[in-house]
UniProtKB/Swiss-Prot annotation:
Alphabetized GO MF terms: rRNA (cytosine-N4-)-methyltransferase activity
Protein name: Ribosomal RNA small subunit methyltransferase H
Keyword Ribosomal protein: no
Function: Specifically methylates the N4 position of cytidine in position 1402 (C1402) of 16S rRNA.
InterPro entries on file: RsmH (IPR002903), SAM-dep_MeTrfase_MraW_recog (IPR023397), SAM-dependent_MTases_sf (IPR029063)
Keywords, alphabetical: Cytoplasm, Methyltransferase, rRNA processing, S-adenosyl-L-methionine, Transferase
Keyword Methyltransferase: yes
Bilayer-spanning residue ranges: none
Length: 315
């Protein structure tokens, strides 16, 4: 996640993430979530003339920033693709199994949250969109105006972890039957009224909006696909660094890494004669999950939920 306030950019866990990549001057690296380029610029500063960096992003505004950087630095290219597709992009360039490090900085960025026209936030009224790439998929408005009440409730509960998901979904459907939703503030007000137990200091629409954003952008599906692709792309000794911003993301990352540390033994029938390598770990995890320092939390409160996990490919 890149924090952007006007022209000031604060990239979460900037130094820690790039340090965890252990950048080699001649290495090839992937920034799976380019954003406004905070991590990419620091990676480039550590690369030599023969180093390479490929940036990925779905957001056209991020791509525009990336194209400017690419014009300034020939070691960098940016592609408008989800990191879930990094395997095919890497294969097209003949780099499968040759990538030195991959960084995934998950979630929505502050430029997206703070731009009312993108429709991500209930704090700033705008079109109810929420798509990272506005040219692909259906908007949040289309979803809440057409999905069955059971599906809306599932999204609020599974992706937003909203305990009043059923009540809030019914309120959405009752209101859309009268007037379809078009604006973020309109939906936020309906959710606010339907939520009977507000948490102090938290907007009652927070969890439902998170669920909608995850649904619209297939965030968890992309994460699962991206993690699998990353493992194939990395060379032996290559690093995978993932920064997550809520428990659903972190759980997927943690379970993925735990599975690979254990090897394939759990996937094989007992007493089956197999080669010893099948029981060997595919990765090793570097250190414990890392969170933002007190200094970073003070400078950037939005970093409070960031969790970084680091793994190294062994085979």
């Amino acid at each position: 996640m890149t924090i952007d306030s006007g022209f000031n950019h604060i990239t979460v866990l900037l130094d820690e993430a790039v340090e965890a990549l252990a950048v080699r001057p001649d290495g090839c690296y992937l920034d799976g979530t380019f954003g406004r380029g905070g991590h990419s610029r620091l990676i480039l500063s550590k690369l030599g003339p023969d180093g390479r960096l490929i940036g990925f992003d779905k957001d056209p505004q991020a791509i525009a920033t990336g194209q400017t950087l690419a014009a300034e630095d020939g070691r960098f290219v940016v592609v408008q693709r989800s990191f879930a597709e990094l395997g095919s992009v890497v294969a097209e360039r003949g780099l499968t199994g040759k990538v030195s490090g991959i960084l995934l900085d998950l979630g929505v960025s502050s430029p997206q949250l703070d731009d009312a026209e993108r429709g991500f936030s209930f704090l700033n009224d705008g079109p109810l969109d929420m798509r990272m790439d506005p040219s692909r998929g259906i908007s949040a408005a289309e979803f809440v105006n057409t999905a069955p009440v059971e599906e809306i409730a599932r999204v609020f509960k599974e992706y937003g972890e909203e305990r009043f998901s059923g009540r809030m979904a019914r309120a959405v459907v009752e209101r859309r039957d009268v007037t379809p939703f078009e604006r973020t503030a309109d939906l936020a007000e309906v959710l606010k009224v339907a939520n009977p137990a507000w948490e102090k200091g938290k907007n009652p629409a927070t969890r439902a909006f998170q669920g909608l954003r995850i649904q619209v952008n297939n965030e968890l599906g992309d994460l699962e696909a991206g993690l699998e692709a990353a493992l194939e792309c990395l060379e032996v000794g290559g690093r995978l660094v993932v920064i997550s911003f809520h428990s659903l993301e972190d759980r997927i990352v943690k379970l993925f890494m735990r599975k690979l540390v254990k090897g394939e033994a759990d996937n094989l029938p007992r007493n089956l004669p197999v080669r010893h390598v099948a029981f060997e770990p595919k990765i090793k995890v570097h250190g414990k999950a890392q969170t933002a320092s007190d200094a970073e939390l003070k400078a950037n409160p939005r970093s409070r939920s960031a969790v970084m996990r680091v793994a190294e490919k062994l085979r």
